[in-house]
Amino acid sequence: MTPKDAVMQYHMAERAKLDIMMLAHQLTTVPTLKKEDKPGAKFVLTELLSVLRADMEGAESVTGRAEFGKAAEGIDEVLSLVSTNQFGIASDKCGEAMIPVTSVAADAFSVLSAEKLI
């Protein structure tokens, strides 16, 4: 991996990790909302998860790293759980979707560190 590729992969992976963590946290708050607020929250989170899935698919296409595709598959599972109002389990599945993305970040960090860029 070239340093240029490492920078791109590191950036994409770290951004994905932050997005996944944010959405996982938001999913845990849905059960605490008022009944009339839950459908709107569910809609917004579903849309954000769909955007995240598309970002992961795009990252896989740009970088060639299958780990981003695995993360997209994990987000698909999260979307299925959200559709059946299983927000707690969906939040846990977000954590699982973050594992392959973390591997990309670690690999890229190793290259950047070896090149003394970090």
Language-model region placement:
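Long, charged/polar, soluble alpha-helical segments
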Residues: M1-I118
